[in-house]
Amino acid sequence: MCANDILAQGAIPLFFLDYLAVGKNYPEQVEAIVEGVAEGCVQAGCAIVGGETAEMAGFYEDGEYDIAGFCVGAQEKELLLSTENTKAGQIVIGLPSSGVHSNGFSLVRKILKDNNIGLNEEFNGSTVGKTLLTPTKIYVKEVLKVLEEVKVAGIAHITGGGFHENLPRALKNGLGMKIDKSSYEVPEIFKYLQEKGKIDEEEMYHIFNMGVGMSLVVNKEDVDKALSLLENGFVLGEVVNESGIEII
């Protein structure tokens, strides 16, 4: 997630540091967590240059842990993305998410609690818990390829606040986007949460990524080239002269 935030500026992730706090240090638990962090860094093409593990008995319950981290990236000033390059008529390309990613879990927990849904309940060939905890997709390597060969006007990392709070970050003031929700299939986990939580569809797009983890804004003539460099990119919508995000 940190690496994706850096990528959204047009920058390259360089290194990552982590902090892990536990109630009791269980080596097998710590090893599994660190392996996950290392795999994320491989996907982001950045190094782990340090970190800290703190054993805090009495503060965290036995078996509980808290993990945080930050990533540092860099780019030449003239290559950083600027919203001033966005304009009406440009095309919005969507990149599929791997699931809920790292946002919206306060609501997810409430939905599970209110409906007495256990994490081990069967869901779509797996379990609810495993589906919800599918690791966040890291887009660094494929998007850097696009940045090298295509003039990208803006990038939005779809995190907390969904489409409505994140897509405008890729645009200059006064512009908006018209999003075609029929351009892709919303993953089943979001339909499940919407049904169980009795949440209005419009509200879902204000909270979750709804199956789109990142978007790129490019000129029409560059769409085919950009799509050829992406694993599963698709045309999500277009930039318009009216501010706000319209989902049709």
Where are each of the predicted segments found?
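Active-site cofactor/substrate anionic-group-binding motifs, chiefly glycine-
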Residues: 1-8
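Short loop/turn motifs at secondary-structure junctions
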Residues: 10-12, 107, 151, 232
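Glycine-rich anion-binding loops of enzyme active sites
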Residues: 12-106, 238
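Short, compositionally biased
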Residues: 105-116
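Glycine-/charge-enriched secondary-structure boundary and capping motifs
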Residues: 28-47, 60-65, 122-133, 137-248
